[in-house]
Curated annotation (Swiss-Prot):
It comes from the Bacteria. GO terms for biological process: L-arginine biosynthetic process. Its EC number is 1.2.1.38. This is N-acetyl-gamma-glutamyl-phosphate reductase. It comes from Clostridium botulinum (strain Alaska E43 / Type E3).
Amino acid sequence: MIKVGIIGATGYVGVELLRLLLNHSQIEIGAISSVSFDGQELDSIYKNFLGRTNLICTNMNEVIEKNDVIFTALPPGLSEDIATKIIENNKICIDMGADFRLSNEEEYKYWYGKNFSHPKLHKQSIYGLPELNKEKIRKSSLIANPGCYPTSIELGLIPLLKNLLIKPNGIICDSKSGTTGSGRSLSLNTHFPEENENFTPYKIGEHRHTPEIEEILSNIANTKVTITFTPHLLPINRGIISTIYCTPKEKIDLNSIHKIYTDFYKDKEFVNVLPLGDIASIKNVKLSNNCHISLHLNHRKDQIIIISAIDNMIKGAAGQAIQNMNIILGFKENEGLNLISPAF
């Protein structure tokens, strides 16, 4: 049985990983760590695990020693050194943070305020969007799990950019997320009286997911792609919905666009292109690893509009990480992820 561990197990992403991994039939959780709750039983921190596990938060070195696959669920800047130890011990590292998502060191320094600590390691990391990089992921031992907003936006745009059908500049990405995307640490913006009955844009023009999205989209289009990205906080726990506006290079009808999307995603089980006339929504992807995409045209402005919806904690984080692990280990891609959203 493959042993799996988590470093940073008690944040929202880490604990969501645990919840999903406990239902995975091909792995066993060997050890977990948490700086904030070192030495404490998991079910004393999160009561939803009572009777399901006797895991105790231990130290990072024990997690590396005891497991074959290690997920690192840490704030930016903390994963590089740890990932180096994991790779040196011939283990698989799936990093949930931002440390390996950007390939350009200058860009990384601009957005995150530091240089790469281990430049050679960055060269061997693979961006873990399975619908784009499945074969590369299969051969890798270091995965940069994509961000939640980038996942929703990139899945929404890949087919158009691969087919060179839209202009690479002037793309507008208007995204809304549940508050779990801000993490478990206390914040005024996510304080209940501030967020309840409210709807707030934040980090306008300066969100750190911007360079990640632009780099991946530019690689797909083989030309520089620029976006205007504005995230918003919804007064809900989980889910992301992105409304993406782009301009076609030549006039194209909606049926042709729909066929391009259905052809591209036909063998990618976690992405569902909705029938024309339907509109993607958070409700129908919540608590699943699915992405729903709906396609629309603004005939008055000759503009393509894509709606892309995911669960930010699953397809946007923990579920996608498990999907990557399944690919690397040769399991069925949906192992542990055969999740259906509740109807209400």
